[in-house]
Amino acid sequence: MLNASDRAIVKSTVPLLESGGEALTTHFYKKLLSRYPQVRPLFNQAHQASGDQPRALANGVLMYAKHIDQLEQLGGLVAKIINKHVALQILPEHYPLVGECLLEAIREVLGAEVATDEVIAAWGRAYGQLAQILIGAEEQIYEEKEQAPGGWRGAREFKVVAKVAESAEITSFYFAPADGQPILDFAAGQYIGMQLFVGGEEIRRNYSLSALAGNNQYRISVKREPGGRASNHLHDQMSVGDSINLFAPSGEFTLVDNDKPLVLISGGVGITPTLAMLEAALGTLRPIHFIHCARNGSVHAFREWVDGLAAKHPQLKRFYLYGEDDGVSPAADGVGLLDQARLEQWLPADRDLDAYFLGPKGFMAAVKRQLKAAGVPDAQARYEFFGPASALE
């Protein structure tokens, strides 16, 4: 545990982190990735280039410093971090490397006059405390997944047993275990980690599981991203019969078990976790409103599947919105952006509902504002980021 002096010193750096946190974390990542290339597979280089990863870490460091006296207030943030770490197989030996580079970055960016030996020592102990919290929580999850029926620890070999084009941009991949043994069940909304080798370089990625674990298989549905190393490798190089290493499913973007009306709102490839959520929710009696937004019909994946479910299950209402009418695809329920009036028209009359939404950041920010304006309680509007988490406000 930190003493009062350490906590006071860490909190005194909050103003500096508010103004210069992103510069600090950008410098930190350059130092970490150049000094310890073995950790490069754990980080998406596109998120480094865009600044998303440094911004997310800067926010995390700031929140930790602000709440150093009340760490229980960081429960939601810590849960997201732990699940991301587990899916990528972050291990105890990685933490000293991060700590070393973080403390050096604090000294170099803030300057020796501000980041004195006393400040660095306090931050060193604060980082050590955080590392122990994360290591302990992650080990507990690793052990639980290893001991669970069908579970495993580390990488497990799977085979691609099917590859299906779902739209002009999205392709589904079905994976079955190479050893033929059972696989770990998962909660709808979770994702799975994978190890890829692209151009001789290892990279790791997380992809949402887009269907429940039927037939002892996992399914992911991947959008081809311009310049995306992992997505283009999967689309162009991964074929039926190929082997791939997967890490056990993880994630805390999952359905709350109650009988409130359920609203699933997605934009683009954000549809993927909502498909598994929809499949799971249809096993209950709760009303479901499924709202999906796409650029046009050619890139709208899984329309026929959702339409088929809606025809069989009166509890399910589905609404589609296209940014443009391509003149070829079946018509949507509207054309344009998802605005306040349209969203309120498609929501259940009972606003004591559970909403889950996922898509591009701007889309999610708009949906969050609109749900609040429509009277949906903040705590019942839940969202997930495919990449590093950041604020939507």
Q: Can you annotate each of these PLM segments?
A:
Residues 261-263, 356:
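Conserved beta-strand elements of the Class I
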Residues 72, 288-393:
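Reductase modules of NAD(P)H-dependent flavoproteins
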